[in-house]
A protein has these predicted regions:
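Intrinsically disordered, low-complexity, charged terminal extensions of DNA damage-control enzymes
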Residues: 1-35, 40-41, 205-369
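Catalytic cores of DNA base-excision repair glycosylases
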Residues: 12-17, 24, 28-229, 233, ...
Length: 369
């Protein structure tokens, strides 16, 4: 088999006149586009940026409440930069992909300290250099908040453009992505740049969906090569699949006589970075060794394992309830710890499966208490 390269896979497809394409999609936007979402009101760079980060990998319906709560707590970039990371992660609990929240906090600090609280919206490159902001997000913030021309290429836009021109290949490949950026550059207007950005995202989110696209309602249906071929759902090509490995861990639910549970803060990098979770051991033998070492093994109860699926692996977690009759020395743990009631968890960031498990633990303690 020939070795796959990242070089050009095909010449740039024949493109439609940009002005005609813009007129079609913007006419559709004027009648059907989304205009009443919370972040579309008072479109400052800060509000648009927060919404764009939240909308990565997350549905609009889910984001609305999170966005409103976030804005109520952090109404300005200065407020976000000044907040403890724990406060940010707490408000992010349930949205997943927690690196987004950590980068949001880092970027806010950079904007305040290096740019005096003003986003560098005059430069896509400068915007894209902020933590967690790539070229497409930078373009979205600039065009939506300021009206300046700045192409975008998020997942929705990739889907629209790959179908429009039947662009073969997974968009994550550099050569395919370069082709799509060239197409995006061609069609992006100078006038009504913000509306154009919004309509391209709207088309992908509401009509040109992954499954069962509503082609009959699409303003460029008669131009769409994938539709002409009857291959709409073949585009964009899927990412080459790898078998996701399974990792195993035991979650130590250490409960003291007052019914409080021990939580440990995870490292800043890696899964659930900066969030609070249970101390973990790899296997049952490690659990026993740890309990024997610290003298807390008199009452151990293994719960039914559950599986949590990450983007690149599966985590099989076995909860272990351990009665902890006395305080443990600091050296028993390698990270910051705290004792909290499982029913009173305000102010700390928790991954969704940990929050669910704490809810189960609270119910269990109520039953046996």
């Amino acid at each position: 088999m020939a070795r796959q390269t990242d070089g050009p896979i095909a010449p740039l497809p024949s493109l439609y006149p940009a002005a005609a394409f813009q007129q079609r999609v913007l006419t559709w936007f004027d009648e059907h586009g989304r205009k009443h979402l919370p972040w579309q009101q008072n479109q400052t760079p800060y509000r648009v940026w927060v919404s764009e980060i939240m909308l990565q990998q997350t549905q609009v319906a889910t984001v609305i409440d999170y966005f409103d709560r976030f804005m109520a707590r952090f109404p300005t970039v200065e407020a976000l930069a000044a907040a403890p990371l724990d406060d940010v992660l707490h408000l992010w609990t349930g949205l997943g992909y927690y690196a987004r929240a950590r980068n949001l906090h880092k970027a806010a600090i950079v904007v305040v300290e290096q740019y005096g609280g003003r986003f560098p919206t005059d430069s896509v490159d400068e915007m894209a250099s902020l933590p967690g902001i790539g070229r497409s997000t930078a373009g979205a913030v600039i065009s939506l908040a300021t009206g300046q021309r700045a192409p975008i290429l998020d997942g929705n836009v990739k889907r629209v453009l790959t179908r429009l021109h039947a662009v073969e290949g997974w968009p994550g490949r550099p050569a395919v992505e370069r082709t799509l950026w060239d197409i995006a550059e061609h069609y992006t207007p100078t006038e009504r740049a913000g509306d154009y950005t919004q309509v391209m995202m709207d088309l992908g989110a509401t009509l040109c969906t992954r499954k069962a696209p509503a082609c009959l309602l699409c303003p460029v249906q008669d131009w769409c090569e994938a539709h002409r071929l009857g291959r709409e759902t073949d585009f964009p090509s899927s990412k080459p699949k790898k078998v996701a490995p399974t990792r195993h861990a035991h979650a130590l639910m250490l409960v003291d006589p007052a019914g409080r549970v021990m939580l440990e803060q995870r490292p800043a990098e890696g899964i659930w970075g900066g969030l609070w979770s249970f101390p973990q051991c790899d296997g049952a033998a490690d659990v026993k060794d740890w309990c024997d070492k610290w003298g807390v093994g008199d009452s151990i109860e293994y719960w039914t394992p559950f599986t949590h699926i990450f983007s690149h692996f599966r985590l099989e977690m076995t909860p272990v309830l351990i009665e902890c009759p006395r305080a443990l020395p600091a050296e028993a743990f390698s990270r910051p710890t705290c004792w909290r009631s499982p029913a009173a968890l305000d102010g700390i960031g928790l991954a969704a499966p940990v929050k669910t498990l704490l809810g189960r633990l609270a119910a269990h303690l109520d039953t046996v208490g």
